[in-house]
UniProtKB/Swiss-Prot annotation:
GO BP term (any one): CMP catabolic process
Signal peptide positions (record): none
Cofactor note: Binds 2 Zn(2+) ions per subunit.
Name used for this protein in its record: Dihydropyrimidinase
Modified residues (Phosphothreonine): T510
GO molecular function, one term: uracil binding
Modified residues (Phosphoserine): S79
Residues bound to Zn(2+) 2: K159, H192, H248
Biological role: Catalyzes the second step of the reductive pyrimidine degradation, the reversible hydrolytic ring opening of dihydropyrimidines. Can catalyze the ring opening of 5,6-dihydrouracil to N-carbamyl-alanine and of 5,6-dihydrothymine to N-carbamyl-amino isobutyrate.
CC annotations in GO: cytosol
Reaction equations catalysed: 5,6-dihydrouracil + H2O = 3-(carbamoylamino)propanoate + H(+)
Gene from which this protein is expressed: Dpys
Protein source organism: Mus musculus (Mouse)
Binding site for substrate: Y164, N347
Length: 519
């Protein structure tokens, strides 16, 4: 095989978020060097050059999965897709970058969590990656560490949990403080939007009713619980003019809240995930416990069968913006930790490998979106929001050569028997998808071709992300200038002012306060 690093992709239809064109792509040293019709390589590059025929195929920017949890210690277990297996599977699906989450325990250092995840990922990743960092508690130390992470460590996104009471959940005043700091340091705030107090009470109620199976998971976390928290997060973010990113939007109700806020001018982005776009929560009522448990995730899939189509509609029309997978996989034996109590089932599903094909099938093949919108929601919008653009999320001169040769007419049947993930089931089992990645190129190297990998652990790199992403902060800065309240200019009051008598007792003070309140 010719040495990697010099590639000429011939005759494909290059698809970016804003236009498509038939052209060749010349890649050298991991970067796109030239685009054009009937492109001839430089004479000194002709030797050792590999030519890939993409005639009749699409040439796409590699996918960016905005939401993964590889080898995540959670609910007494650890997700089985580690940073090697998970990123290898991502490449097979046409994804060339993931953004995972470093999540500290309450009271623990954010920076130490970040370094822990870096140490786990750096030697293993097969594709490029970055890290969001979670804020699970609040103090002056947390505030300072957020600043350090944004300034020195390449982190420009911080996630707050409104659920998982007693574990990761933060209160409204902590959300306000964290959002305020995000704005100060030029980061984007992310939220897991569910009302954790209502979930905790609902879970007790379900168990008291004898509902111990996976259906209890959805019953104690209904749509209203997600929608309420989504609106609350948007309200708090708006109060401090902080950009907000709502992860895993799972219900019609929550999606409507995001859509309404965007149409009202709020700087907010919604992220549906492959699971919510490709299947629904009727699975929780399966009489086969393991099948039902395989689908347990938070927020849950919704039993309304119209939900996936509704979310795809909003993704297609711009009310929702990006797509992730929330890939957090636990094998059946791990899910069985909750065989007698649904609250103990580790939350999480697969999706990092199948995200691109599921969205093509449900979005493009169905006629809801075109190829350009597909690129926007699977790659470009994420690159813009998280300040990776145009190095990522675009095929242009100077961009990283993260490229997928995509066959829009080919089909594949999703199955745990053939997928490349470590988990022993697949929530999309049996789904036939149009849209198949034939070749995946990461950092200028062909890493996956015709079902064969050519990649080793550590090929991928950590990609730092700078704060104050122009795509989101242009509007934030303008809103600061035009929407910040100002005092009314008026002449000073010069009339009589009543003199209050001194109060001698606490009771008099209280009574006086009441009287003043009614004056």
């Amino acid at each position: 095989m010719a040495p990697q690093g010099r590639l000429l992709i011939r005759g494909g239809r290059i698809v970016n978020d804003d236009f498509s064109q038939v052209a060749d792509v010349l890649v050298e040293d991991g970067v796109v060097r030239a685009l054009g019709r009937d492109l001839l390589p430089p004479e000194d590059a002709s030797r050792g050059l590999r030519i890939l025929d993409a005639a009749g195929k699409l040439v796409l920017p590699g996918g960016i999965d905005t939401h993964t949890h590889m080898q995540f210690p959670f609910m007494g277990s650890q997700s089985v897709d580690d940073f090697y297996q998970g990123t290898k599977a991502a490449l097979a699906g046409g994804t060339t970058m993931i953004i995972d989450f470093a999540i500290p325990q309450k009271g623990s250092s954010l920076i130490e969590a970040f370094e822990t995840w870096r140490n786990w990922a750096d030697p293993k990743v097969c594709c490029d990656y970055s890290l969001h960092v979670a804020v699970t508690w609040w103090s002056d130390k947390v505030k300072e560490e957020m600043k350090t992470l944004a300034r020195d460590k390449g982190v420009n996104s911080f996630k707050m949990f409104m659920a998982y009471k007693g574990l990761y959940m933060v209160q409204d005043e902590q959300l306000y403080a964290a959002f305020s700091q995000c704005k100060e340091i030029g980061a984007i705030a992310q939220v897991h939007a569910e009302n954790g107090d209502l979930i905790a009470e609902g879970a007790k109620k379900m168990l008291a009713l004898g509902i111990t199976g996976p259906e209890g998971h959805e019953l104690c976390r209904p749509e209203a619980v997600e929608a309420e928290a989504t609106l609350r997060a948007i309200t708090i973010a708006s109060a401090v003019n902080c950009p907000l990113y709502v992860v895993h939007v799972m219900s019609k109700s929550a999606a409507k809240v995001v859509a309404d806020a965007r149409r009202a001018g709020n700087v907010v982005y919604g992220e549906p995930i492959a699971a919510g776009l490709g299947t629904d929560g009727r699975q929780y009522w399966s009489e086969e416990w393991s099948h039902a448990a395989h689908h347990v995730m938070g927020p849950p899939l919704r039993p309304d069968p119209l939900t996936p189509g509704f979310l795809m509609d909003l993704l297609a029309n711009g009310d929702l913006t990006t797509t992730g997978s929330d890939n957090c996989t636990f094998n059946t034996c791990q899910k069985a930790l909750g065989k007698d109590d649904f609250t103990k089932i580790p939350n999480g599903v697969n999706g990092v490998e199948d995200r691109m094909s599921v969205i093509w099938e449900k979005g493009v093949h169905s006629g809801k979106m075109d190829e350009n919108r597909f690129v926007a929601v699977t790659s470009t919008n994420a690159a813009k929001i998280f300040n990776l653009y145009p190095k990522k999320g675009r095929i242009a001169v100077g961009s990283d050569a993260d490229i997928v040769i995509w066959d829009p007419e080919a089909t594949r049947r999703i199955s745990a028997k053939t997928h490349h993930q470590a988990v022993n089931f697949n929530i999309f089992e049996g789904m036939v998808c149009h849209g198949v990645p034939l070749v995946t190129i990461s950092r200028g190297r062909v890493v996956y071709e015709a079902g064969v990998f050519n990649v080793t652990a550590g090929h991928g790199k950590f990609i730092p992300r700078q704060p104050f992403a122009e795509y989101i902060y242009k509007r934030i800065k303008q809103r600061d200038q035009t929407c910040t309240p100002v005092p009314v200019k008026r002449a000073p009051y010069k009339g009589e002012v009543t003199t209050l008598k001194a109060r001698e007792t606490k009771e008099d003070d209280t009574a006086g306060t009441r009287m003043q309140g009614h004056s």
